[in-house]
Amino acid sequence: MPKPTKGPRLGGSSSHQKALLANLATSLFEHGRIKTTEPKARALRPYAEKLITHAKKGALHNRREVLKKIRDKDVVHTLFAEIGPFFADREGGYTRIIKVEPRKGDNAPMAVIELVREKTVTSEADRARRVKASQAASQDAPSEPQAAEEPAAEEAVAATEAEAAPADAEATDAEAGSADTDADEAPQN
């Protein structure tokens, strides 16, 4: 049994929300990134990711399910021919939302929603190789910097003491000078 979506309808009725999300998804798949209000971007993210999941499966049934929502056949072809295969190795997280400055006219919070185009999935062997390399580097690195840091720390303490000594001398000279002027100005009885 169909149940209505909870929460606000993004400026209208349920049918308006469906049309709005379909149009936003069409623009997203056509251009790769769009700028819209933040609530619309947050509503579009799961909608678009479900459509991309259908495109990854690539069956006729999935194509017809997407065509129910997106009416532009060229965009659906792009979705199934390019976007779906690109995300074949990725398990979700196909879109990214980046907040940008508010809209000038009404100060509405704006965001850019875009398709993630970087490959982030790595093989376990590659990941294990990088972990070993980082552990080896971290074991070799601490012995040298600690030895180098100790003399540097001693030099820094000596430099701050040297800087503090002239400043203290200047302060006492200034205090003495002000005491002399106070004595000259004081009335004598």
UniProtKB/Swiss-Prot annotation:
Organism of this sequence: Mycobacterium ulcerans (strain Agy99)
Residue ranges of the region described as Disordered = 125-189
* Annotated Pfam families: Ribosomal_L17
Protein family (similarity comment): Belongs to the bacterial ribosomal protein bL17 family.
Molecular function terms from GO: structural constituent of ribosome
Q: Which domain of life is it from?
A: Bacteria
Q: Which UniProt keywords apply?
A: Ribonucleoprotein, Ribosomal protein
Name the record gives this protein: Large ribosomal subunit protein bL17
| UniProt KW Transferase keyword | no
Bias regions of kind Low complexity — which residues?
140-180
